């Protein structure tokens, strides 16, 4: 999953801010097989938390940096709090 998320982030223009919901939505639209294969029986909340942790791990390597939180649509089309990231 880390490699897939890194490739998504690599396609985001430098300086852009995005949130974890954006990465999840991209996975669902462009690589739904990878999204489903890596779910491992987790609940949606748990799995999306895992995806956020993967992005945080990528941030520790310097590919992105955390820039606060957003209030954005989740996969259920409901607004919820979500971590924001910026690609330097």
Question: Which residues make up each language-model segment?
Answer:
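The alpha-helix within a helix-turn-helix
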Residues: 24
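Phospho-regulated, low-complexity intrinsically disordered regions of nuclear gene-regulatory
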Residues: 1-11, 21, 29-88
């Amino acid at each position: 999953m880390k490699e897939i998320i890194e490739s998504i982030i690599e396609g985001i223009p430098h300086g852009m801010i995005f949130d974890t919901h954006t990465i999840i939505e991209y996975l669902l639209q462009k690589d739904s097989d990878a999204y489903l294969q890596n779910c491992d029986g987790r609940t949606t909340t748990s799995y999306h938390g895992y995806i956020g942790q993967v992005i945080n791990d990528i941030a520790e390597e310097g590919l992105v940096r955390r820039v606060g939180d957003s209030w954005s649509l989740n996969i259920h089309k409901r607004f919820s709090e979500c971590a924001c990231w910026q690609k330097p």
